[in-house]
Structures are given as C-alpha cells and as structure tokens.
C-alpha cells in the first residue's frame, strides 16, 4: 500500500476537502482517466483496491498511472475507549480528493477494456467519478 517514507508531523488535523482541484485536472500520461465529481477522503487501501481491479481487468497489459498519493495520517482511538485522554494513534493514510481531480490514467489497451477497467476501479472508491478521454 502507498504511504509516505518520512513525515514532518506524526498526526494531522482533520481538515476539509478543497472546493475544486487547482492542479491535476487534465490527463497528463494516458488516453483515459478517472476524474472525481465529489470531494472526499480516499484511503490507501481504497486506492490499492482500485489499482488491483483495473490491472486485473487489463490483464496486465498497457500502463496504469495513479495520480493521487495518500499523505495525510488519519488517527483513530481504539474501540470502547472513553472520550478524552488524547487524540489516538495514527491508523492509516489518506488523500483529500477535490472535485475535478484525475485519480487514475490508462494507456496502451483498447477503448472498451480501458473503460471497463476504470469502471471497476471507480466501484472501489468512495467518490463519484466520471471517465474522461483525451481528444487529439
């Protein structure tokens, strides 16, 4: 799973998702991409599940790019613990995905295979998405 090698701080504020994405809104590598419609927090496990689903559908042909990286530590308190006594330890990493952000890109497979792979990947993600394509 994706996680940062080093962090400046162990715990992060909860934060909010930005209104619309300022960068990463256009296709940079592939011919087909998965673009978010909602803003939400996507975990490293969800990204990995989407990657596995897409590569399995592509039968390991072509190329898949992951354009988001989980860099925000999310902390959680254990089950059945009373309120207070600190924030809790970091459990997993997530990324705040803004509306309009490209999350996955695909190149090197037929159109119907790419569309099916991105549909399968989008089913694993908590955000609503749409598939975009490059017009040349």
UniProtKB/Swiss-Prot annotation:
PROSITE patterns: RIBOSOMAL_L16_1, RIBOSOMAL_L16_2. One of its GO terms (molecular function) is tRNA binding. Keywords: Ribonucleoprotein, Ribosomal protein, RNA-binding, rRNA-binding, tRNA-binding. One of its GO terms (biological process) is translation. The keyword NADP does not apply. CDD domains: Ribosomal_L16_L10e. Transmembrane segments: none annotated. Pfam families: Ribosomal_L16. The keyword RNA-binding applies. One of its GO terms (cellular component) is cytosolic large ribosomal subunit. SUPFAM superfamilies: Ribosomal protein L16p/L10e. HAMAP family: Ribosomal_uL16. Binds 23S rRNA and is also seen to make contacts with the A and possibly P site tRNAs. Belongs to the universal ribosomal protein uL16 family. Part of the 50S ribosomal subunit. PANTHER family: 50S/60S RIBOSOMAL PROTEIN L16 (PTHR12220), LARGE RIBOSOMAL SUBUNIT PROTEIN UL16M (PTHR12220:SF13). NCBIfam families: rplP_bact (TIGR01164). This is Large ribosomal subunit protein uL16. It comes from Rickettsia peacockii (strain Rustic). The gene is rplP.
């Amino acid at each position: 799973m994706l996680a940062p090698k080093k962090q400046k701080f162990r715990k992060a504020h909860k934060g909010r998702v930005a209104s619309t994405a300022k960068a990463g809104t256009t296709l940079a590598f592939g011919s087909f991409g998965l673009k978010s419609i909602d803003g939400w927090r996507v975990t490293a496990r969800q990204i990995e599940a989407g990657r596995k689903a897409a590569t399995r559908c592509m039968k390991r042909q072509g190329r898949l790019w992951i354009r988001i990286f989980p860099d925000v530590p999310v902390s959680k308190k254990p089950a059945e613990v009373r309120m207070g006594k600190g924030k809790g330890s970091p459990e997993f990493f997530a990324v705040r995905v803004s509306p309009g952000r490209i999350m996955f890109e695909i190149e090197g497979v037929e159109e119907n295979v790419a569309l099916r792979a991105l549909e399968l990947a989008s089913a694993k993600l908590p955000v609503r998405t749409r598939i975009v394509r490059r017009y040349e």
